[in-house]
Amino acid sequence: MSKEYEHLFKFVLAGDSGVGKTSILFRITDDTFTETHITIGIEFKIKTVYIEGKPIKLQIWDTAGEKRFRVHNSHYRGCHGVIIVYDVTDQRSFENVPSWIEDIRRYANENVIKIIIGNKNDLVSQKVVDPFLAQEFADSLDIPFKEISAKQSINIEEAFISLVKLCINRIEETSLKKTQSPEKNNCIIN
């Protein structure tokens, strides 16, 4: 009997309320768009993607962005990647990204992979967050960055695939380090 999937990755969507985390979740898992669903607390959906023909199962957790529902350490426990989302039409949501990064630093595994996502890039005339500034900020933290649109399905798949590939690379690097044992010094003491 063969395995159903090559890897299982838990991803958490984090960011302020109203930035479109739920819309991203529905777009990536069901290829649908909704503006009316309200997340209370936390929920998750499953998505299988294929990398080099191998099935990779994603467990994607959607979190409410309100302070009273803020993600805590139990939500980050065991996660492989965090998608930090801000709204390109809401400067404050971008200014709060460092606070979300601090929560991740505090509660998640130190090796968790992060990506910063600017959602709603289809609203060109309402854009207030400069994408070059956002890219510069992400680069300064060595975190990948993408602008997307959950509504128009722009760059969503690409963002998730890049996160999956980073997770696979991390696993392969870790595995390689474990198999390479340091050279032993042959020392004879008389």
From Swiss-Prot:
Bilayer disposition of the protein: Lipid-anchor
Binding site for GTP: 15-22, 62-66, 119-122
GO molecular function: GTP binding; GTPase activity
Chain residues in the propeptide: 188-190
Gene Ontology biological-process entries: intracellular protein transport
Keyword NAD listed: no
Xref: Pfam families: Ras (PF00071)
NCBIfam families: small_GTP (TIGR00231)
PANTHER family found in the cross-reference section: LD44762P
Primary residence: membrane
Residue(s) carrying Cysteine methyl ester: C187
Family: Belongs to the small GTPase superfamily. Rab family.
Lipid-carrying residues in chain (S-geranylgeranyl cysteine): C187
Presence of the UniProt keyword Membrane in the record: yes
Taxonomic path: Eukaryota, Amoebozoa, Evosea, Eumycetozoa, Dictyostelia
Keywords (A to Z) from UniProt: Cell membrane, GTP-binding, Lipoprotein, Membrane, Methylation, Nucleotide-binding, Prenylation
UniProt-recorded name of the protein: Ras-related protein RabF1
Subcellular localization, as worded in the UniProt entry: Cell membrane
